[in-house]
Amino acid sequence: MVRIKDVADYVGVSTATVSNVINGKEQRVSKEVREKIKKALDEMGYVRNHTAMMLAQTTSNMIGVVIPHKDGMKIALEDPYYSAFLGNLEYEIRQHGCYMYLIAQQSEEEIIRQAIAWNLEGLIVCNMPADELNSLSEKYSRGIVSIDSYIENQSDVINISTDDFGGGYQMGKYLIAQGHRKIAMLADNDDTVDHHRWMGLKQAMDEAGVSISETDHFLFSPSESVRELQMEQFFPDLQNYTALFVASDFYALEVSSFLQSKGIRIPHDISIAGFDDLLYAKLARPKLTTMSQNMGKKAKMAVEALLYLQEKRKLERQKQKQNATLKPNLIENPDADNPWTLPVKLVERESVRRIV
């Protein structure tokens, strides 16, 4: 690897002079010498050591992204939701001249250790339980943006969420409008996101006078092997419903595949609807009716929220009298009362049929 000293010796200048050119401090170097150094850098194939440069600076331009570990999955990226969201998040981070540093959720101590070791600008934390997130925020002060954690926004923590209750409510109203009265929900937990979707569904059905209870709420394991056994156990009961609302597209497609393997015709015998509107939803057969959340906007909001916290922290350090305020219109969110909550919309495809 070519070093700064090698370039300096080649041109016949000091290492400080070469360093000034590399770091954009060209006003300190004559035009003639500057051009010689740049030519030498190209000819010798010099590549900047970004790791060393980052550790030497007060800022790293690296944003930490913490993704959860899901029981039964080797890596969270096996879940297509996280793959899609992280792709959008990396793009938005890059648009702001920063880099994404991915942390698969480990202990609180390990998250903080990596954040400090890599001088991260802040953390975007996905689906961390509220108690763990509150504990982390007490020990890490550079700013945290949580995704779908359902905590109260704090001075150094902002939660970005989807209107999960509204999504469940809209789906319930839609299924009822299609003539369905025997509706069940399937999910892998009854916490945070999935809980709010279930409560929204219940609200819609209660308003319509349609009976629904906890016996219509099927919870299965995040572990695929365990889930397969549970679906076999659920199958006799699932045949009593005309429509199934599944908490994610990933699980909805899995449920659809399982039922079709048992000879159930989708949607003729049982209708199925999901949540997220992933790419696979429109590629499935039949194409999946689902609630769509705008992952691109969600990622954009997350990065802007973290940059807002950075700016606020900077102003506080400078002891300026006027606090920074991020106006809701900067994130192009029509809901001014809940600027950090994303609306959802129904996408009607082929997996739900109307019952006459």
Q: Predicted regions span which residues?
A:
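Short acidic capping loops at alpha-helix termini that bridge into adjacent secondary structure
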Residues: 182, 212-216, 266-271
